[in-house]
Amino acid sequence: MARRKKKQAPWRRWLRRFVIVVLGFVAVSFLLVLPLRWVAPVTTAFMLQDDSGRDPLMYEWVDWPQLGERLALAVVASEDQRFADHFGLDVAAIRKSIDEKDDRGYLRGASTISQQTVKNIFLWPGRSFARKGLEAWLTVVAEICLPKRRILEIYLNVAEFGPGIYGAGAASRYYYGSSPDRLTDAQAALLASVLPNPRRLRVDNPSDYVRERQAWVISQMQRLRREGWISRLSP
């Protein structure tokens, strides 16, 4: 007489399904992010959702050597000076930015460059806990899969610098008729000063706040340059 197969407890079945779903989610996450180590994104989620009215959107990929040190330093100075030190999430900086929110209502530094990169490429605008949680997870995956210099290279190429203007290459040519590696400190600092809200803060019509921010970014660029900051990025 054949032995009857012992019936599996329902909780074990649900646990097995849960583990399969989690492992599948992890695998898909790495499959999405890892190719960015070698392949430039053709488009991003933010570009696909763009409602600026610009048609076609302005976007061109520029490799790291042609991006230039000035713009890299300017963006790091403006957005994430601890970029080389943290693992994608900088809780201390988030708390500090909330405490130092100025009287104009501008909130700076709430997201690291790594977070902004994965948000622009894979996600959608919004502040829901689900989106923030997914952003945090993909940021960790990006930090595992990609060197710091590659993350910064991608960010400089996909960040929006004006309505429908994506990446340093398109922004440099549109605003200055130049390639990114030929920008002056002042030009690079002005581009960086409108991040991460280029619809409200404008390069072509800078407010007093943007000009103040530009001057501060220039001073921070000079400090980072003296410290040899760029040399800290692994290729």
Give names to the regions the model predicted.
Residues A2-P235:
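Juxtamembrane regions of bacterial inner-membrane/periplasmic proteins
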